Structure formats: structure tokens, C-alpha cells
């Protein structure tokens, strides 16, 4: 197996390759420039590198821009020949106890002033791009699930996520009780 780490400044992007296929883990940055170059140039280099790989999939570890901005750029600016065979996303959607988390993620995205653990969230942007480009296969990963026949999802830990969500929810309920009554 070969591991290729891409310099994306503040963000994550690396590729795990074996003889059969590759898995890009995250694809984003918060930087507008990386080593003096516009980030779109860095994204284009990564996309060009990936275009030589026939079977490629993507794992997004979570929904922050420093992990998915390159994917959004690619989906907006490149034709479908650059698409991934499969995109793996953390499953924060299926379990009922995660419904508050989903509402807070979407709310944070709407107001662009995230109260969630000090990160910018862009779930709307991702969902919009995936719906617009319906050639992508998406698989939701819950903690412990094996994917690609050799990797195991370690997140989301729904207990930890629920605890963090409850903290944010309680803080928002304290500050904005009328709004929270409408939302929940």
C-alpha cells in the first residue's frame, strides 16, 4: 500500500493506494492560498493526480470545510469523468438520537456562525452538490462498520456526538428559548 499526503495547508487530504483501487481520505482546506498558490490550483493538481486512477473512492471523515472544500470545488468545476466511484460519509442521520445533531448541523450551516465545536460546517453545500451531481454513489458509515473490505469506521461515536450536541442544545436553549421551542 502507498500513502500519498497532499499539502493543503490547514486541512486534510491523503490517498491510500493499493493495486486494486484507491481511497482518498478527505479533500479540503480552509486556506485560500497554499505556499503562495491559490487553493484551486492545489485542488486541480490533486484532481489531475486522481484522474490517472481508474477505481477511486472518497471517505469524508466529517462535514467541515477543511475536509470537503476540494470535493465541492471538483463537483462544481469538473465534469463527471472526475467523479468518485463511491463517497463514504459518517452516518449522523439514521439513528433517532442523532436528530438533534442533524438539526444543529443544518442550523449552523444556515447561520454560518457555528456553535458546534469551533468548526465551520457545510452540510448544505455537500448535500446540494451531491444532489446536483447524481452520478455519485453515497454510503453512510456508522461506527464499527467495515468498508472497502479492510477499513473500519471509527466515527461517529454517537454517544460522544450526542453529549456534545446536548451541550450545544442546552446553551442555545438558555440563550434563545423561543427559537429553540420552534425548532424542537
Question: What spans do the regions from the language model cover?
Answer:
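Active-site-proximal beta-strand/loop segments in catalytic clefts of secreted hydrolases
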Residues: 27-28, 61-63, 156
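Short linear motifs at secondary-structure transitions and domain/linker junctions
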Residues: 1-2, 32-37, 61-65, 126-130, ...
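Generic recognition of cysteine residues
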Residues: 13-15, 55, 115
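Conserved beta-strand hairpin/beta-sheet module of binuclear metal-dependent hydrolase folds
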Residues: 1-51
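Active-site metal-binding motif and surrounding structural segment of the metallo-beta-lactamase
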Residues: 36-89
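Flexible, acidic/histidine-containing loops and adjacent segments that form or flank the divalent-metal
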Residues: 1, 73-184
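Active-site environment of divalent metal-dependent phosphoester hydrolases
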Residues: 10-12, 31-32, 63-69, 94-97, ...
